[in-house]
Every structure is written in C-alpha cells, then in structure tokens.
Amino acid sequence: MNVTKDENPRSRSQDLHLFHAWMMLIMTVLFLPVTETSKQNIPRLKLTYKDLLLSNTCIPFLGSSEGLDFQTLLLDEERGILLLGAKDHVFLLSLVDLNKNFKKIYWPAAKERVELCKLAGKDANAECANFIRVLQPYNKTHVYVCGTGAFHPLCGYIDLGANKEELIFKLDTHNLESGRLKCPFDPQQPFASVMTDEHLYSGTASDFLGKDTAFTRSLGLMQDHHSIRTDISEHHWLNGAKFIGTFPIPDTYNPDDDKIYFFFRESSQEGSTSDRSILSRVGRVCKNDVGGQRSLINKWTTFLKARLICSIPGSDGADTHFDELQDIYLLPTRDERNPVVYGVFTTTSSIFKGSAVCVYSMADIRAVFNGPYAHKESADHRWVQYDGRIPYPRPGTCPSKTYDPLIKSTRDFPDDVISFIRRHPVMYKSVYPVAGAPTFKRINVDYRLTQIVVDHVVAEDGQYDVMFLGTDIGTVLKVVSISKEKWNMEEVVLEELQVFKHPTAILNMELSLKQQQLYVGSWDGLVQLSLHRCDTYGKACADCCLARDPYCAWDGNACSRYAPTSKRRARRQDVKYGDPITQCWDIEDSISHETADEKVIFGIEFNSTFLECIPKSQQASVEWYIQRSGDEHREELKPDERIIKTDYGLLIRSLQKKDSGMYYCKAQEHTFIHTIVKLTLNVIENEQMENTQRAEYQEGQVKDLLAESRLRYKDYIQILSSPNFSLDQYCEQMWYKEKRRQRNKGSPKWKHMQEMKKKRNRRHHRDLDELQRSVAT
C-alpha cells in the first residue's frame, strides 16, 4: 500500500496482504509471553465504582429519574455551571457539586410529532422524544439549544441572565425555530457543532432518513446573511459523513484568514463497489465565506478536506490502520493558532478489535492543505495527483484585502477558482501523526475507546500531557505518555476507573481545570470525577513515587496534590522513571520492609492453606521468600505441583511440618523491590489436631450436659415458685419445645412431609367425592 497517497485505492491483492498482516499481528499478540513490558500496558491501579464512591472522588448525578441519555454537555467555568442536555430535559448543575441546588427545564416533543414518529417505525422510548443535541453559548446572557423533537428538530434560546449569582435559566418557548441543518433528526447520529461570532457551524444530516449529510453555517447578524452549506450535487464533497468535532482556529494574525476546522469520517468508494471503505478526514472552510456569485450560490467556496492517517507501520510495508475516528480533542498551547490535535480511532474490522490515540500538529495539517490537490476523471476512476494549472487565487484561500485588494469576498472569486474547488475539494496527501505512529493503543481488549480529553500538567521533573480516555464499557483510562531516549515513547496507564455502576458507553466528557474535575456523560447517567486521588496510592514516599502520577508528589507526610511553586520544598516525585530509591533514599520507612503488613496463620498438616498477597499495583511482579524456623537465611520459593503461585497469593497443598516459617511477599516495580506482606505460618501436626478434637468433643458433651442441667434447674424453680403451674403443664411445654426444635432442625424435610400429607388428604377427598357421585348415579 502506498502510504504517501491519500486517495489511492487498495486492490484485492493488497487487501489480502493486509488481511495476512492482521492475522500475524493477532497471533503475535495472543502468543506473546507475559513480560515486564506487557505488564506496563496493564493499568497500575484499577478502581471499581464502589472504590471510587468510598474515596469520595466520584459523585454521580442523582437528580434525574426521568431524563437520561446525557450526551450533550456545556461547561461554563466563569459562571461555575454545567448545562446538561438529556431526554426531554435541560439541567443546570453546579461544577462544585452536581446534586446541589440543580435546576431543570422540561422540554418534551409535541404529542403529534411523537405519534408521527411512532407511525414511521421509530422506537417510542429511544427515538420518539426530544433529545437535546445542541448547547452552545450564543452571547453573554443566552445559550442556543436544539433538540431532535421526535425526528422534527427545533431550536431556541435559554436565558441565563446577566447576574452570575442568580441565574434565570428559562427557555423562550414563544420563539422556537426549525432545527433542520442545525441539529440531527436521529438522537444517536454522530454530530458536531460550534458557535463563534453568533454563527452556528454544524455537521449533521439534513433529512429524516439521514442520507444527506452537510456542513453548514446558520444564524449570524450579517445584513446579507444566508445559510451556507456543502454542495449536495457533488458526491465527493461529503459521502455519508459522521461528524465528530468542529473548532474555530486562526491561521495567521490576520482575522480574515480565520477558518473553521471540522473532523469527520465518511464512506469512500473507489472505482467499483467492492473498494468501499471508511476514511477519517479533516476539513476546513473560511469564516468569511459567503458563497459564490454565479456558481456555488449559498455553498462553500473554500471547502477542502484531507485524510487523517492513524496506523501502526508494519515491518513488511503493510500498515495496521485505525480508520474510524471516534473523538477529537484540541489541547490549547500558548499559540492559539497551533493547538495539539488528539484523535481517538478504532478499527473497522469485526475480527480485530483495536483502538488508538494519534496526535497531529496544525503545521502538518496546514502543509497538506497547501500541498497538491487530488483529481478524479469520473466516478469509475481513482484519485490521482492533479498536475494541471492551479488558478489564482489558490482555491481554498480566504478572501482578504491584504492578500488582494480586488477580492473583498468569495463572491469576487473568478469563475475558474469556483469551478476548480467544486471538482477538487480533496487534497492528495494525507496527514500523519507527529510520531509516525499512535501515541497510545489498545489491542486485543474487550472494549473500545470512545472519548478523550487531555490535561497539560507541570510536574517536578517536566511537563506531561495526561489523557483521560472513555470506553464503551463505562470505564475511564488515565494515561500519560512519557518521552524516553531516542524519541521513544512509554505508555503508562496510571488508572482504570469504573465510573458507572453498570457497563455503558461513555458519550461525552468535559474537563474543568478550575475545579480539577472531569464530567462524564453516558446513556445511563452523569458523574463528576476528580482528576487525581493521590492518597489511594499509599502512605509511604515509595508508593507515591512508584505511582508516576504527574498530579501527585510526596510532601514529607503524605502523597498529595503537587503544585508548582518557587519555594524550595521537599517534594518527592519521579514521573519519568518511577524510582523511589533516588527520591526516598533518606526516608527509612519508605524503603524498608518494616512497613509491610504482618500476619500469623495456622495450617493443619496434610491440608491446604492459602497465603494472600495482592499488591496495590497491577504492574508489580511478585516473588515469595521463606525463612524457615530456626534458620537465619531466606530462600526463594519456586512453584511446583504442591506450591502454586497465583495472582492473589500462594496456595500450598498438603502442608508439611517443614513449611512452617516466615513468608515474605516481595513486589517489584522497575528496579524497586519491597516487602508488602510478612506471614508467619504455623503448621499444626495432624496427630495433635486429632487429640485436640477428641478432647474438645468430650468437653463439649460435658458442657451440653451441664447446660441442660442448668435449664432443668430453672424449670424446677419455676414449678416450685408457681403453685398454679402444674407438672402436666411443664411436661406439655417441654414436649412443644422439643417438637419445635426437631421441626427447625429438619425444616426442609418437615415441609416436604407436610406437603405430602396435604396431597394425600386432597387425593383422599377427591377419591371420596368420586365414590359418592358413582353411588348417587
């Protein structure tokens, strides 16, 4: 496969070659021995939903019993609020505590629209309702909101008011407008929108069936305002596009060059129908595009698109591609023109399940848009590089007075420029990740990545980009990518967090840097998740350093949130290597085995016993040592058919007297080894145990006799002290007690006997009735 070209097709032989490459990769992954390198891909810390609740670092939103499907979030750091779009509802929540004094707007779909939706064969619960898909800040006082309206999208304005302390939060239901080309009809269709300069840019389907997809601009205060969209007549502009994200990004210091970049995936058909595939794209348009004068009227005249590549280079030239873009995140930098672009991709194969994160630079994206165009003679031909004359001004360039005083708007573009852009919207070259390969990948796991947000964190030993990755099973991975020697990258999965009680796909995530919180939405709920939980790593300096979490450092007393400061304080942290020896060498308790838990266990000869040892870190490897009774030396325990090493500890079958001693469970991470558990095992001889049991049995009989005697003595006193209490009454009482005891002792058997007795009685009465009827006749 020619990796330097975007639109070159894959032939059948190339597809077959790629299939063999996939199979070789699968076999390699399946039969790869478990090494320390593979252990690094395991999450170091795995916390369940219950663990997160107990740590008070995960707060579920409890205020919605009727409105679910939380896939639209709008975070307002300035006001300290989170707007949540759900089914038939819009919620106003506090960023500090989701459940504190929240407000809601009930906005259902019209009843007649719900009935029409049902008649069209749509699901009454999952589709025929008003699912909120657009929440965009319109100005300082209003938010623009759109809902699917039971496949009849509507939009309106929510008034928040100017007072930040007392928000109004009211929907203006008297000025609702059509949501077509602004909001999808289908609540489950991928969709992207952004509001800038009071213009709404949306990528969505424009019809009920969802076949016609378009990227549009609407609203605005321009006097000659018209909605602008992609050209529906040209199939190679957009082909079944699924929009993922859209962002305003300035290209230069000149505002006339400002552009809207949008990311999507679409179908690509090359030549014949057998060459259909899914491609991920980045597209762009100029913000000041108003359409053409004689051609492309009310259509984009600056629309261009290029392919995004996310693949693992193969040794034999066949790359492993992750073609389906799932989410995009722009990490801001000091230069607003050059944010870092993070993308989550998945494989299209149903056989091979994999996900990857690829990182792109805006410089590389712009270079592709400034490069050669792709050309296609007809629908049956393939894309090739265009080598002909390129008209002036270069197609895709924004009109600017500084660029050309004669071209003040896109309506001033010459006809040959409009004609060229109409037939050549595709760039020939593709955009590749900055490292030439994925920054992070998950292969051969039971989930796929769905969402991403990234936080740039300053640590003691450098700066790191921490990725929070949502999955389709309701977990969040906290990942840091660390640069090593020779530009090699190390993927470190710090945490795997089960943020929902039951598996559910994560649909949206918003990051609050001010609150240091992550807000995670799914079909089933919304949770507020802390970015860090340093105290869960341990109570020693070594535990804190081994965590390699850029958010956390040892402050001398505990593992706590690291804050960069000019003051010289003893903050111990080693994200790059995770080596406690270099950081905690002067803290004896942190590197000594004296901090290990100590337990005493008794085992019986010839029986089995289990010595539990579960390291907090899943990346640690465990070794066992024994110091036998009367011996000063320790020896390493080697597993055999009698001694079995498991992930949870050591199973010793058929205990022997020589197994007595002190057992040390040592965990190793990187080069650091420390004892986490010390177990003293005492083996009781079998003969001694039998004698003890015999003595206990005899002693138990005496105790029962004494206890029974005490009961009898109480009863005798009761008879003597109560002249009205006869001996017959006492005997009858004792008989009932014994009967009750026997019944409780064998209650299942007793119930069975009672049922049998009832059946016999019923059968007897039935037979008697039949006999009486026969005699009567």
Curated annotation (Swiss-Prot):
Signal peptide location: 1-37
GO molecular function: semaphorin receptor binding
Glycosylation sites: 139, 607, 724
Record domain Ig-like C2-type: where: 592-680
Residue stretches of biased makeup (Basic residues): 740-765
Record keyword Cytoplasm present: no
Sema domain span: 44-531
Basic and acidic residues: compositionally biased ranges: 766-777
GO biological process terms on file: cell differentiation; nervous system development
UniProt entry keywords in alphabetical sequence: Developmental protein, Differentiation, Disulfide bond, Glycoprotein, Immunoglobulin domain, Neurogenesis, Secreted, Signal
Localization terms from the record: Secreted
GO cellular component terms listed in the entry, alphabetical order: extracellular space
Record InterPro entries: Ig-like_dom, Ig-like_dom_sf, Ig-like_fold, IL-1RAcP-like_ig, PSI, Sema3D_Sema, Semap_dom, Semap_dom_sf
Region of interest (Disordered), ranges: 740-777
Taxonomy, superkingdom: Eukaryota
Ranges where the PSI domain occurs: 533-585
Disulfide bonds: 117-128, 146-155, 286-398, 310-358, 534-552, 665-731
Record-stated family: Belongs to the semaphorin family.
Job of this protein: Induces the collapse and paralysis of neuronal growth cones. Could potentially act as repulsive cues toward specific neuronal populations. Binds to neuropilin.
Domain notes: Strong binding to neuropilin is mediated by the carboxy third of the protein.
Name this protein carries in UniProt: Semaphorin-3D
